[in-house]
């Protein structure tokens, strides 16, 4: 359907949102959609002359009104719309005309629909023609001689008064076409041109002369006059110098490829151009030229003039702004064709591809007829043929010496080494007309750039053109080029020439994807180049051409064999195309031909059936040559001249008989048929062939089993194996007959039997004639019990684990025969020197000592745990055992004997803590000293045995801890007394040295002296750590201070109390030794040398801290009814939280 309505804008509207359309008062709008929900309609605005686009958007429906029709029209023919914007109608239909601004497409309405219709399909009413005639924008047209041109001059100043200056020349073609149609209907068939478009000769201007040759003396182009405008060649100055010309440069104006004369000062208007071309001989046609603007095809009013007498073609746009007029001679037209209302022309020098829209098919036919007469007269085929025959000379062939870049429309680009044909070298000595052989382009180039290579022989004197006239040769050549161009056009989807669609009306709703004029020109040139390149392809040698056929016998081609490369056969076809065909696709005959030509064997690429047939045929030929009659069979008639078509073997039935799945039978059958296999190859089929054909492994076993059974094949090579190895009669998983083995049964291996290991020397005796008597000495093997015979066949498992077997004691109960070996024969005794030389003496053997078997100690089982053990643990005493007293007196190094320390004694009253390790033995490396080192204190490492500590009845763990601490204090006092006694016996007193740098604090009962050399030490307090038993902290013991014996100066101060030093490790390890400076202080305090230092107080000696028991193990049981300290209370577990009774103090509600 077309438009829903044609409306005109009543008010101006500026868009307020996206998607809306700007309209002004008086704009013509085409309504596309009418909304039923709101007052916004979708419309398209008619494009003005300045704005070629037709925007689409939303407009308010109260800003527009329906446009009134401007006239009526009657349909001359039936028409069916081609696009959505067009309108269909029938013959004699009455149409309402709304817009006639486009000369070819009229906006009309018919039966409530609106759209565009072709102008030549309708006839406007008299009112419409009368209304359009006096329009002020009517452009000038060629008129009879009685109407002077000067009378139209006053119309020029009136054109600015028009509200639409750009539409001034638009209505003229429509009015002219309407007049032409009216005259054709009222009168007889029209003449060559309508009277309106055939102006008479002007009295002021002479007839248009023919195109003169370029004069040598002319250097520049003078200011053109009316009588000389059509004679301009625009290139004389360039013909005599390779440099840029002094004349104006002819520039191309995209996209219409029109020349511009702004540099020449040409300001002549359209009227002057028309007046210059009006004189007799010219047939004028007011048509439209299809040009491309912004990617769209538009129609540009143009005047086409054809002068058959002078052989001139004139093209002049209606408006001067579209470009000046251009002229070509007849020989510059290389192509013309007709397609409906379109006329296509190809012109050179300057090159231009033109698409004219004649408006009517009759007009287009008339134009093409005139162009045909013009081309025939320009070619003068008969006259040229007579002249060529009389002169006996042809065109010259030349080669380009230098690169030349065209600087004008009549020149052509050439490169060094290009081959050219010299068309004209007579008109000018410095500029020659040539045709480039590479792309068939013609133009002028400097003659100094070309070197003549010789003459070109005429094509009509030899070859297929011999005896044909030039006209017939040209006709054949044109027909061939037309066919090639048509093929290329179909291939490249280029709609040029026959079959081209009519150009549709340019619209924003209908996008066109055709190329522009320059693109069409390039495509046409490429078509010509491709046609020439195809014709210039090399052809194969006819003597070596043969027919090649593929393996399926479906395709064949005549070509020449070139080479065999990369598994492909290179062929040269008759049309010059070179192809490469895989070897596997060629027939056997072709492969044999290639083998004969190259000497390379191609048996791997041949079908297996053909190879078998060839082998059998060769064997039959050998048999026949030897006089033996060939065996009857399919190969007996291989050498016969006539072949008998035998029916194909039914492979489908064959695979069915092999128990192959029905769905796979057809696929396997096709594979065998593709390989051209028949029943003759069945005896030779093996697993490898089947795998190559794509048969599955399971089906391969079935097929091989069927063939073995059918042809009674017993060879190992017929069996199917895995990994390419033959298994002989039986395979790994199948038996001799092809049946699958049951490998799930596995028997018990036979037991090893021990034989006699005594070598019988009689077996090596030389008496070979004597045979051992059957009564021999019984061997242990003979006396061994014979195992029970097993059944050959068993049902179920072959394992005999359930069989009754003799006990092993029976076999070992008969060793007498084995312990009595046979008496060895006595060897002759060799004495004397013979014994020394003899090799028969037995070598000496060392006597091996029998190792004594040591009885391994039997591991004693740990005693059973009974309640009495736990009862006895509570009576044990805790504490550290007393160290062993050392021998008194000084111990010299000579008295340091290697002694093993005595193991600790375990008594019934020992503590729960494991006994401490013994003191370090004196055999260990010691410092060499004349005095005995202090005894090493035993250090307990690790933790005690994991035994629960159970308090006896009536006591708690707190009581036990207090008793333990008292025992430890007593033991510590005993150790200190022992140390004092040892020091007195040794004759030396230990002197504490060094400073305590870890604890600078001083106890309250210590009196500091001025020259104290060591800081007192605090008492060592063991670390108090928390235990899971919630034991109260143990009270630190208070050791008795040692009485230090000062040396040197006698001090009147009482000795300081010694305090143990904490080390920060744990209570089990002694503190680390600190380096202590010794010696006297020199006079560092600044006093004179006779200063007597005060006495040095004794240095306290650090003693090892006693060990404290650490409670380990599980918590002790809770005993009720015992008074004393608070014992550990059992903690209830496993209860469930009761949130209903939860309080801040008891959040879980227990």
From Swiss-Prot:
GO biological process, one term: actin cortical patch assembly
Biased composition (Pro residues): 1030-1039
One Pfam family hit: PH_SLA1
Domain annotation SH3: ranges: 2-69, 70-127, 393-455
GO molecular function, one term: identical protein binding
Domain of life: Eukaryota
The protein's name: Actin cytoskeleton-regulatory complex protein sla1
Organism: Sclerotinia sclerotiorum (strain ATCC 18683 / 1980 / Ss-1)
Gene: sla1
